[in-house]
């Protein structure tokens, strides 16, 4: 062999063998919990001791929430004279109250409610609108928005159509994009509520003062991060079709909505999981709502009868767990009760007829060692 020849080293044959480490070979030390009466029974009693009182506390807290609901779906059929609201349209929760009276009338597109607050409602006081039979949780509905547009980007029609979620409400017949586009924005709840005027009686015409309620701060802080002021100018965009009442002459440089500060819009865009839901409309966090007769004017815009739905105005206080929620307290109490009852039953069974259950000495691979 010449010196110029290159000596080739033999290649080592590679084997597809896994690493011999304990982790790869699954031979790490392990411990498995063995269920015996002496481990299960304390756990059941502990769960019962924790969950049952917790559920009872939640139930009691919900009982202390003061709440008034008035279904005003049929208000526009009443006429311009005050008439009594049917008792079936009123729901309430007050400690020592068995009856609450309310009156209503309509004029034009305004529904006027005059109702009784029988007990003081301590601040904060919240006003919610409640819709029934409205399915915001439909997938086609919940995804019908362009998040880049809501974050302030001036999206073109081509970009909206390529994204596809706003279909069929990306643009009008002239090719101008809707702002904001999509079904969920187009169906924005647009009833508006006034603050409360206090009166001496249902027949009185002289108000005693104003109980101010505001929309400021009603949206969640994390929702505000999802919206920015738009970079569109008024000539580039048009309002969604169902916003014609709010913007009869379209957008101008002075009236383009700033969705980053529009709490009602942000609240509506957070889709509800169930067909019956409540969303915050107004609040007062500083002043208690004193007992008396109050009046609220509601601009009646949002249709509900077409899909056999209803709409309700609801006034409520809060508790340590939020608003009224009996289900959560009952659920915790039932789980705690079942755990405690199971513990008692198993304890009696073990005392009356004990069995060699869960004892590791009686496992097949341990029997030889014990003998």
Curated annotation (Swiss-Prot):
Disruption of the gene: reported phenotype: Abolishes invasive growth during nitrogen starvation.
Keywords: Disulfide bond, Endoplasmic reticulum, Glycoprotein, Membrane, Transmembrane, Transmembrane helix
Record topological domains on the Extracellular side: 61-325
Membrane topology, from the record: Multi-pass membrane protein
Top-level taxon of the source organism: Eukaryota
GO biological process: phospholipid translocation
InterPro entries: CDC50/LEM3_fam
Protein's cellular compartments: Endoplasmic reticulum membrane
Membrane topology (Cytoplasmic): 1-39, 347-371
Keyword Flavoprotein: no
Assigned GO CC terms: endoplasmic reticulum; endoplasmic reticulum membrane; Golgi apparatus; phospholipid-translocating ATPase complex; plasma membrane
Intrachain disulfide bonds: 75-111, 166-181
GO MF term list: ATP hydrolysis activity
Entry's family note: Belongs to the CDC50/LEM3 family.
Job description of the protein: Accessory component of a P4-ATPase flippase complex which catalyzes the hydrolysis of ATP coupled to the transport of aminophospholipids from the lumenal to the cytosolic leaflet of membranes and ensures the maintenance of asymmetric distribution of phospholipids.
Protein name: Phospholipid-transporting ATPase accessory subunit ivn1
Annotated organism of origin: Schizosaccharomyces pombe (strain 972 / ATCC 24843)
């Amino acid at each position: 062999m010449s010196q110029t020849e290159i000596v080739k080293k033999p290649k080592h044959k590679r084997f597809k063998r896994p690493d011999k480490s304990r982790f790869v070979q699954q031979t790490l030390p392990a411990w498995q919990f063995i269920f015996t009466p002496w481990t299960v029974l304390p756990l059941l009693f502990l769960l019962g001791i924790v969950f049952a009182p917790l559920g009872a506390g939640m139930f009691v807290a919900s009982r202390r929430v003061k709440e008034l609901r008035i279904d005003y779906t049929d208000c526009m059929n009443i006429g311009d004279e005050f008439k009594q609201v049917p008792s079936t349209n009123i729901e309430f929760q007050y400690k020592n109250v068995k009856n609450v009276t309310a009156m209503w009338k309509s004029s034009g597109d305004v529904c006027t409610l005059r109702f009784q607050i029988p007990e003081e409602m301590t601040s904060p006081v919240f006003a919610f609108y409640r819709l029934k039979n409205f399915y915001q949780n439909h997938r086609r509905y919940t995804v019908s928005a362009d998040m880049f547009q809501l974050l302030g980007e001036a999206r073109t029609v081509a970009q909206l159509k390529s994204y596809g979620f706003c279909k069929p409400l990306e643009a009008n017949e002239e090719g101008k994009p809707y702002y904001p586009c999509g079904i969920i924005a187009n169906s924005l709840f647009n009833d508006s509520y006034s603050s409360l005027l206090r009166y001496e009686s249902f027949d009185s015409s002289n108000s005693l003062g104003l109980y101010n309620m505001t929309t400021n701060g009603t949206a969640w802080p994390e929702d505000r991060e999802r919206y920015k002021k738009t970079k569109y100018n008024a000539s580039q965009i048009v309002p969604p079709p169902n916003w014609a009442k709010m913007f009869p002459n379209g957008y101008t440089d002075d009236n383009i909505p700033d969705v980053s500060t529009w709490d009602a819009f942000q609240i509506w865009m957070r889709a509800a999981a169930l067909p019956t839901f409540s969303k915050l409309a107004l609040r007062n966090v500083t002043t208690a709502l004193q007992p008396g007769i109050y009046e609220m004017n509601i601009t009646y815009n949002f249709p509900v009868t077409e899909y056999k739905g209803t709409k309700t105005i609801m006034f409520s206080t809060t508790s340590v767990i939020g608003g009224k929620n009996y289900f959560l307290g009952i659920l915790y109490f039932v789980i705690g009760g079942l755990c405690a009852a199971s513990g008692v039953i198993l304890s009696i069974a073990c005392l009356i007829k004990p069995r060699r259950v869960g004892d590791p000495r009686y496992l097949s691979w341990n029997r030889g060692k014990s003998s």
